[in-house]
Amino acid sequence: SAGISCAIGGDDTYRLLPYLMEDEEFIKAVEEHPKLFTGFSDTTINHLMFYKLGLSTYYGPNFICDLGEIADEMLPYTKRAFESYLEGNESDEIISSDTWYEEREDFSRAAIGTERKTHKEERGFELLQGSEIFQGGLLGGCLESLYDVLTNSRYEDEKEVCERYDLFPNKEEWIGKILFIETCEEKPTPELFEREVLLLKEKGVFDVVNGVLVGKPQDEAYYQEYKDILIRVIDNEKLPIVYNVNFGHAMPRCALQYGAVAKVDMKQKKIYVNR
């Protein structure tokens, strides 16, 4: 096959690690036969595993949520991201979508062919602080998944399993990177969001990255609260933070390639990615 699209997330994805990271045949296949790999949410675990093995993957559309969209057509902005995989371009240009969509509440047969509720994008990419232009290699994922990797908040053995394979990048690996993070469909409360951001701070991530990209919250849940927490907890006014980027759980979504060098230009309100 030419590539793999994850079906959806999978909150116990970490349980795959012993079966894959100790399989020499699998590791050799990753090295010798690299393939396109795309997905988001708890797929973050897979992305970090492949990143460790040297494969550059895409935090982007998945099968059920995007290719399986129950409206008549895939969302145009997301479709463009998916098509970019197939075109093989050496660079990509990401702009804000002019429309955002609410998450569906009805996934029954009766909803087939119905359109999502839409809203005009009023804000676009927001520079919360720091330089208007910055660049670095892309690294990150779903904030809740990263938190789960570092704690036993969801499963009692997840932290131990992930530590065994050094899944979370060490501080040196974050140097010069652009951290990208986004919140999941559970719409974490501001209190939980603060704990999650604080944990990344305690790991020293914000001391060494060149900037932060934050995805639009699904349905714009806690939109202002999250902004306030990011600025207060990170507490480094020189670190660029760009908010409301179209990736992750909110519809529509672009694709961010792990390890690819991105140049964020907020004068142009664009993100340029060299693959």
Where are these regions (language model features)?
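N-terminal small/polar loop signature for handling phosphorylated ligands or for N-terminal nucleophile
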Residues: 1-31
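Buried hydrophobic positions in well-ordered alpha/beta secondary-structure cores of metabolic enzymes
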Residues: 4, 42, 146, 212, ...
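Structural motif
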Residues: 5, 38, 178-182, 213
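Short, acidic/small-residue loops that bind anionic groups at enzyme active sites
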Residues: 20-50, 56-64, 240
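Conserved anion/nucleotide-ligand pocket segment
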Residues: 56-144
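Oxyanion-binding "anion nests"
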Residues: 137-190
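C-terminal active-site/capping subdomain that shapes the small-molecule cofactor and substrate pocket
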Residues: 183, 187-275
